Every structure is written in C-alpha cells, then in structure tokens.
C-alpha cells in the first residue's frame, strides 16, 4: 500500500441520489467530500487541505456551480484548481459558459458513471 496521500475531490451536488452515487464510486480512488450546495462546497474547499478537483452541479439552490467556480478563482489556493461541471443544461451557450467559468469538462445528465470516472482520472493525472 502506498503512503502517497489520495487526491481530494470536493463535490457539490444537491440531488441526494447523484451525490451518493458519486461518493460511492469516486471514494474507491480518491478522498471525497460531498456537499449539497455551493456555499458549503466553497467553505470546505477554502480550508486546508485544498482539494485537487471541484466537481460541481451547475444548478443548485443559492450559489450555483458557476458562482462557486468564480468565487474559487478568487481564493489563492484555488485559483488553478480543475473544475468539472455536471448539469442537465445542454445548450451550446451553457457549455460555453461552463468553459468560460474555468471547467475542464462539462458533463451533461444523464451521464455514464464510467465516462465521469475516466474524465476525473484524466483531469487528476491518473
């Protein structure tokens, strides 16, 4: 067993079924912290240890994924953190907005979990 610390992912997903599934699958490979809204995700991400990835639902009550991404870019430890957006919004303007918000990937619902895991691994270099 390796002594290398596992990479840390902060997830913001307000749908309990999706957040549970993401936690179950991704925690096999990474340290996962699940939050259910944008404000909580930003609070967790802003405290040490900094996450290696933010996995954000775009449509959440209160602070949406785009707002979390914009706020994260203002924090010194999170300026260059990779972001993956999950969303039901599929229009071209939404994808462009996601990329402009700093997303490495923009995954639309419904998604295949294997595809998401592959994108996470690619983003985190493993």
PLM features: what roles do these ranges have?
Residues 13:
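Conserved acidic carboxylate
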Residues 16-34, 123:
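Two-component/phosphorelay signaling modules centered on CheY-like receiver
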Residues 34-53:
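Acidic, metal-coordinating helix/loop segments flanking the phosphotransfer/catalytic sites
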Residues 57, 87:
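Active-site residues of response regulator receiver
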Residues 60:
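Receiver (REC) domain active-site loop signature in two-component systems and cognate sites
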Residues 111-120:
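C-terminal output helix
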């Amino acid at each position: 067993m390796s002594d290398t610390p596992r990479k840390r992912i902060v997830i913001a997903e307000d749908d309990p079924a999706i957040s549970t599934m993401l936690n179950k699958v991704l925690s096999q490979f990474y340290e996962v912290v699940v939050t259910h809204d944008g404000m909580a995700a930003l609070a967790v991400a802003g405290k040490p240890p900094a996450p290696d990835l933010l996995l954000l639902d775009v449509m959440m009550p209160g602070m949406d994924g785009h707002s979390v991404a914009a706020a994260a870019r203002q924090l010194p430890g999170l300026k260059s953190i990779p972001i993956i957006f999950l969303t039901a919004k599929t229009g071209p303007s939404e994808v462009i907005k996601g990329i402009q918000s700093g997303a490495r990937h923009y995954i639309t619902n419904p998604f295949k979990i294997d595809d998401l895991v592959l994108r996470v691994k690619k983003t985190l270099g493993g």
